[in-house]
Amino acid sequence: MSAKTEADNTTAANSGGGGVGSGTSSGGGASANGTATPARRLRTRNSTGNGTNSGSESVKKSNANDEPSTPVTPAGATGSHTHAPPGISPAVMERPMPSVPMNHASSSVSASKKYHNSCPHPTPTPAPTGHKKSVHTQPHSSNKFDQGKNEEFHFDTPPECPVFRPTTEEFKNPLAYISKIRSIAEKCGIAKILPPATWSPPFAVDVDKLRFVPRVQRLNELEAKTRVKLNFLDQIAKFWELQGSSLKIPMVERKALDLYTLHRIVQEEGGMEQTTKDRKWAKVANRMQYPSSKSVGATLKAHYERILHPFEVYTSGKVLGPTPTSSGSGSTPVKLEDGGGTDYKAHEIPTRQQIAPPNETNTRRSKRFGNSNASCGLSGVTPTTKPSAGVFVKTETKEEFKRDLLSSFNAVNSGGSPLATGTTANTRGASQKKGGEPPALIVDPLMKYICHICNRGDVEESMLLCDGCDDSYHTFCLLPPLTSIPKGEWLCPRCVVEEVSKPQEAFGFEQAEREYTLQQFGQMADQFKQEYFRKPVHLVPTEMVEREFWRIVSSIDEDVTVEYGADLHTMDHGSGFPTKSSLYLLPGDQEYAESSWNLNNLPLLEDSILGHINADISGMNAPWMYVGMCFAAFCWHNEDHWSYSINYLHWGEPKTWYGVPGSCAEQFEETMKQAAPELFSSQPDLLHQLVTIMNPNILMNNRVPVFRTDQHAGEFVITFPRAYHAGFNQGYNFAEAVNFAPADWLKMGRECVNHYSMLRRFCVFSHDELVCKMALEPAKLTFGIATACYIDMAEMVDTEKKLRKSLLEWGVTRAERRAFELVNDDERHCQECNTTCFLSAVACECNDKLIVCLRHYTVLCGCAPEKHTLIYRYTLDEMPLMLQKLKVKAHSFERWLSRCRDIVDAHTPTSVTLQELQELCKEAETKKFPSSLLIDRLNAAAVEAEKCVTVIQQLGINKVRTRSDHNQEAAQYKLTMEELELFVQEIDNLCCIIDEGASVRELLVLGKQFVERSESQLQLSLESLEESELETLINEGSSLRIELQQLDLLQKRLKQCKWYKRSQGLRETSSKLTYQDVKNLLHIAAADLDPTDPYVDKEMRKLQQIGADIEAWESQAAKYFRRLTQQHELGEIEQFLKSASDINGQVPSHGLLKDALRKAREWLRAVEQLQQNNHVTYCHTLEAMIERGLNIPIQLEELSRMQGHLNSAHQWKDNTACAFLKKGTFYTLLEVLMPRSDAINIDSDLKPRFQDDFLKEKNPAEIVASFKHAEEQELLDMRELRRQNMNKNPMRDMFCLCKSEFRNLMFNCQLCRDWFHEDCVPPPSATNQNGIVNGGSGPGTNRPKWLCPSCVRSKRPRLETILPLLVQLQQLPIRLPEDEALRCLAERAMNWQDRARKALSSPDVSAAQEAIMAQQQQKRRSEGGAGVGNISSPRKPRRRGSLTKEASGSTESDADDDDDEDECRLRIVEDNFSNDEDEPRTAPATSTVNSDLLKLLSDSEIENLLDLMMEGDLLEVSLDETQELWRILETMPPTLLQAEAMERVVQYMQRQRQQHTNPLPTSGAEDSNDSLMVQNSPNSNSNSGGATGSASNSGRNKKRRSNDTGGNSAVPRKKQSTPKQTPGKKGSAAAARKSDAKASPAASTTPGADADAENKQANGGNTNSSTGSGGGNSATTTPTPGSTHKKRKRTSTTATNNNNNNNNNSTNNSNSSTNLNSNTTSGQGAATGGNNATGGQKKHAQRSQQAAQEDDEEECRAENCHKPTGREVDWVQCDGGCNEWFHMYCVGLNRSQIKPDDDYICIRCTKTVAIGTQGSGHSMSVASTTTPGKQRAVQSAR
């Protein structure tokens, strides 16, 4: 709402609900006829520039309008208003909301958020002197918020008004933007504008200085219907109060009785008497929505008779009729107290709101000369002023009233009311004094003691005197009669009627008693809202507040009072916006001070008409501010002079608005009058007073369009001309509003003045004066304003001429010029219509102070026309001159207007082009011509023409004539012929000429011609049609931009024609139709053709028959392809193929079936030939036949049978491969089963021989011969390979699979005799499987034999496994290469088995076996039943150079080897290959067993056994006889060739050892490069020339050891016996070594050692010596040099061997020599005595030097050394070969647990020993010489 809008709410205005009667207003601002001064007139228009008025401060109407906004607390306030309540728009919330600045002088805006403004509200006027001052109360509510009532109350929310969001560019010009949106927003009456996010003005009010007195609003008194009810109840209560009783509202059906509704319904039914007579009380109860019950009607009747009927009687005058004077009257007076109910407290609306009429200085009318004494009301009107009917109502005096009342007493049926009727005044006068004395009506003094009813003076004790008029009455004459004298004041019936019917005072808003600061008001407002809703203010939804507001205003029993700080003048308090005159503006504030949207600048813009008014009209061209709280409302109103208004909400909670479009204003006013006729009957101008509100739902139910919006902080709300609007505040907020008037308002402004004249409403300013002022200064006007002013002034001048002419004709001849602009507005208004006069007026000689306008000169007075004088401002000649000045300004507009009239005239032929029309429209926009219907029509015409051009361009009509017929573009849009005709008509009706119109007309002609030709072609039959003619016609139609129906028909016809002729052509040709052609033709026919055409139908039937025949044949052919066909059925297929010739089409599968038949017959012939062969067919031949048969489409039964045979063969082959082939092998099954084609290594790429013989189809005899030949060749090749391998020289030949030099640990294969590196072949445990390692399980041997991977190619299954496979072969009807190979292999194995058994059964061999068994039994007896594992029996004495064999049982390694399979380890003693050059090389003597064997077996038998062993090893089958042979041959000495090969290896290793000058590394066996342990075959120790050697253990001191439980624990090993020591050495070593330091034994060899010493050592257990025999198990190693004495810092002990210089060979003990990969030999004999000594000396010297250098800085070699400290630290040295030192603590040993004869082996050497253990049988290993007792001790130590 506008500034004025809200302000008018607070003006003292006539109360629509104050009473039913009207009276004369006593204020100076009220008219004499009782017409209320409009609320707008309470505002003052100041004449001076500083905004001051000579009178009191200007006051604005009090009508609150805004929408809820975020509550904001100004700086310095303690209230919390920084929250954003629900409903705040995101656009506003995105901007920070700072507090209001503290000091306006220092800072006009807060640094953060600048708050936003809302709408104007009413300003109170002080109560007049002498009036009873109403008691002011703080805002309160009689009832607390009830959620249930709120939800039960039904309120239909009106639709939202439009919301506009201007861009930054659009926001620059507010009036232009408002004009732009006016066409949309004006339909709703209100609109909301959201500024750009960058626009955030500061809040410039000085909050410390701002103090204001708000107005009090009682919400339920605002609503029209509620006010009527309250007024009625107040009259009833007052009536009974004057009767000495208090009114109590009775309860009916547990609800308070609505007395007003009951009274209204009863009156509508004809009154109480008629209702009772017609028995309508039940109907009355129904209409009041009570349940249907007789008792309710009777109850209502009783209440009506008791409460309402006496009131009716008194007010109608019937009560004053004479009654019988009987003192004994038995009538019982009615007592209201008897009815019970709720006490009614009168609202006293007239008393509370007796606000004095505003002084003229407080009005909004302009006072340009400060005439504060001039009255704006009608107080100056003399009593002789002739009242106007319906406006001025006579006010009777009290005497006249009494006289009339007395005269009515004499009329028995007098029903006339003695009350005068009339409109209420604008302001309230002082209430009439109750005790006023009426003039005497009776001269006789006794008359005053006579009853005025019975006219008798007797019964004085019952005589009552009225306290109002002193009349006397008998108590029994009264109706109802009184039983006693009432206490207190008593009024007679006349005074009661007079008092009750006293006219109501004008209704207005009461002024609060206290003054608020902004902070105090905010605290009060927030406290009220929080206490009312019982929740924080920001958590209350706007919908809930809205529904509660309308519930409260419609309730008569809930009193809610709020306060509203409305109409705060910016001239007095400053504006919320920074202004140009503000002091100390911040740099950022200057932009907003000059902004066009600043409400201080907006009304005065160049395009605003209000800028031409010199005076400051507060609230209209000077903004007003409003401080709202929850429920504070502004009532329904529209703006003064129907101007625009703009409202800005600076900050705070939202403001809710409701608006009605200006076009529906009259409908709105009529609805309001119908809803509350009692108010409008006494106050016709009620809507001008801004004191009445009505629920929008009532308006909506009467089809009045209502729109709503919620205005948030930072948002604008615009109201449009004559748009009624109202609203309320959601909470504490601050708003600012002002009016403005753009050029388009000027026409509405004149209509408003005429409307005001009919309503007798005062104007705020003179409209004619404003127009004339602008006409006098046309240069200052914009073109738009000048044009609008010219149009308005032309109308004004025409009207003035007519009025003056009428006045002249009436007879007025005198005239007088007067400058009306110098006269106060209150002195120049028409006495009839209150219009402010400016151009002219009429005065009379009888009263020169009164004037009227020229429309009402006849009602001025009754004098003759000659006495009247015309007062004028301008002559009739001057006004056209003024008009001409405007015309010159608007001359271009006039010319433009004249030309436009001709263009839009439908009867005038147009010659204007579209370009000229667009130029005219552009000229109107550029020169800002005022909006008019002509401009709208012109713009519409231009738009229509542009649309036509656009359509033509989109259709491409103008391109039709320029394109080739064969290069058509698909038109995006096309018109039908009907649309094209209408389009041509539209082009012809345009206001301009468009160049493209000719093309459209030509197109229409071409379209009509095409239609005619198309129709003729469509009538022809298919046989008569020509494709070329149809195609040509279609191309022509496609080139036209027309949607032609005939074009689709032609295209369909063309398809039919093409299809028909194609089908006929295909059928009539010599070749048959293919099935695909038939399908395509039928598909096209079904999809695109019309089957109803006879030609098409006939052709389709023929094609369908052909297709059916082909499908039937194809279906039968498919069966032949799918089913299993036998040979005799092929003839049936051949007959079926012949039937295809009877079909008129080509059968697709004919050729395929014919070819399949041919192939099937050929394949069956080939199978028949194959079956005629004498031998069984090979598998690969059968596979080829099956593959060939699978390519035949026909399923042959013979093929399925052959596939079954082939699958059985493959299954047998898989089973055989599973039995023979190892996992991951690269040998094929055939290669494994056949003899070796070449005795070659695995990596050989030579192609195997003899394999092709098995793949070729040969008879069985030939295959067996080939296999035999392959066997013989295999034996020859193997012998040659063995010879080559044994003749290899380690120094120059290559070994192993990798073809590299002889190095590190080497394994010797017992079959091919080649040497293999440890890391090139699988470990021995991997090959020590059943069937691979032969001879390790019998009682006569403990040493397995090792075969290389090249020699062991398969799993070597036992013969029992092979036999089931051979049985399965008998069931296979086909042959396999593997089949033949397996048969030959089985036959070969059984043949060898027979020969081996024969050889083993000979007497000599049997005797040898018995000797071996006897030896084993003797050894077991000598060992005392000890296990075979780690125990070695003592050897018998032997001669020097003899060969001895010692077998050691398998040993379990629990510490490092996870393999649960027992490993058989063969300990090889050193061969007696002497390194002494002087000693002759002779064959060593054999032991007792060897000698016995040599005696028992002849050379031929031995050779036979060796050949059988080699041939058995070649077999890929495991046989028991191979083990028996191995047990015999392992005891044989090596052959001469083997011995020579071994000697070469030993010599090579000796040279390698001599080349190493540095001591051997101690890091582990894996780091050694000069130590190698190899194993020879069992016959390597034969007497044919092998080198021998002896070895003896060197004595040493014992060392404590135990099982290491730490990370370095190792397997402890005990020695077999304690070697001899020098006397005193052992004790000294044990005593002196506190840290358990020890000295490694020094190993030395003595070439001159004799056999006795050696035998003595062996027998005494102190020396472990053996010969290098053992069936090929002799090995060459690098002997370990003797260890030197080690020193420790704390304690050191040196131990010497007692026989260092006595032995020729160093004994390799398991605790002092390396195994497998270590640098020392393990239990072998080597002819390296001298080198051993040399090595020992070198090592001794080096270790001694190192010990001296390192001294006690040597570190513990444990992986996780704990660095123990203390006086004594115990150490231990490894005996496993690395000779490293360890802290006992670090390896988990305890000194008390170690015995002197224990050895310690570290974790590294333990792993090395484990590796040697796995390699036993083919590599050198540590000899275990522990005695059984000590062995048990070691086990217990573990």
Curated annotation (Swiss-Prot):
Enzyme superclass (EC): oxidoreductase
Location in or out of the cell: Nucleus
ZnF PHD-type: positions: 448-498, 1293-1354, 1753-1808
Pfam families: ARID (PF01388), JmjC (PF02373), JmjN (PF02375), KDM5_C-hel (PF21323), PHD (PF00628), PLU-1 (PF08429), zf-C5HC2 (PF02928)
Residues involved in Fe cation binding: H637, D640, H725
Loss of function: phenotype: RNAi-mediated knockdown impairs habituation learning.
EC number: 1.14.11.67
Residue positions where Phosphothreonine is found in the record: T323
Single GO BP term: oocyte karyosome formation
Comp. bias (Polar residues): 136-145, 351-361, 369-380, 416-430
Domain JmjN: 161-202
Ranges for domain JmjC: 591-757
Coiled coil: 960-1049
Biased amino acid composition, Acidic residues: 1453-1462
Biased composition (Gly residues): 15-31
Catalysed reactions, semicolon-separated: N(6),N(6),N(6)-trimethyl-L-lysyl(4)-[histone H3] + 3 2-oxoglutarate + 3 O2 = L-lysyl(4)-[histone H3] + 3 formaldehyde + 3 succinate + 3 CO2
ARID domain residues: 226-316
UniProt note on regulation of activity: Inhibited by Myc.
GO cellular component terms attached to this protein's record: chromatin; nucleus; Sin3-type complex
Region (Disordered): 1-150, 321-380, 416-437, 1401-1462, 1548-1751, 1814-1838
Cofactor section: Fe(2+)
PTM-bearing positions, type Phosphoserine: S1422, S1433, S1474, S1635, S1640
Self-association and partners: Interacts with Myc. Part of a complex containing Lid, Myc and Ash2.
Family classification: Belongs to the JARID1 histone demethylase family.
Function: Histone demethylase that specifically demethylates 'Lys-4' of histone H3, thereby playing a central role in histone code. Does not demethylate histone H3 'Lys-9', H3 'Lys-27', H3 'Lys-36', H3 'Lys-79' or H4 'Lys-20'. Specifically demethylates trimethylated H3 'Lys-4'. Required for the correct regulation of homeotic genes during development. Plays a role in the regulation of the circadian rhythm and in maintaining the normal periodicity of the circadian clock. Regulates the expression of clock-controlled genes including tim, per and cry.
Protein name in UniProt: Lysine-specific demethylase 5
Organism per entry: Drosophila melanogaster
Lineage: Eukaryota, Metazoa, Ecdysozoa, Arthropoda, Hexapoda
The encoding gene: Kdm5
